């Protein structure tokens, strides 16, 4: 179970970093599409 929790945490971190990297340079419309 610990490994699954670790995987979920890593995925969440990757997703949040990816969303930030994608939505930062885009205009509000683009970030609204992503989020």
Curated annotation (Swiss-Prot):
Residues 1-21 form the signal peptide. This is Probable L,D-transpeptidase ErfK/SrfK. Its main location: periplasm. It comes from Klebsiella aerogenes (Enterobacter aerogenes). It comes from the Bacteria. Keywords: Cell shape, Cell wall biogenesis/degradation, Glycosyltransferase, Hydrolase, Peptidoglycan synthesis, Periplasm, Signal, Transferase. Pathway: Cell wall biogenesis; peptidoglycan biosynthesis. It is an enzyme of class 2 (transferase). GO terms for cellular component: periplasmic space. GO terms for biological process: cell wall organization; peptidoglycan biosynthetic process; regulation of cell shape. The keyword Glycosyltransferase applies. It is found in: Periplasm. GO terms for molecular function: glycosyltransferase activity; hydrolase activity. Belongs to the YkuD family. Its EC number is 2.-.-.-.
């Amino acid at each position: 179970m610990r490994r699954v929790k670790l995987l979920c945490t890593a995925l969440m971190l990757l997703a949040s970093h990816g969303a930030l990297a994608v939505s930062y340079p885009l205009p509000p419309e683009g970030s609204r599409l992503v989020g």
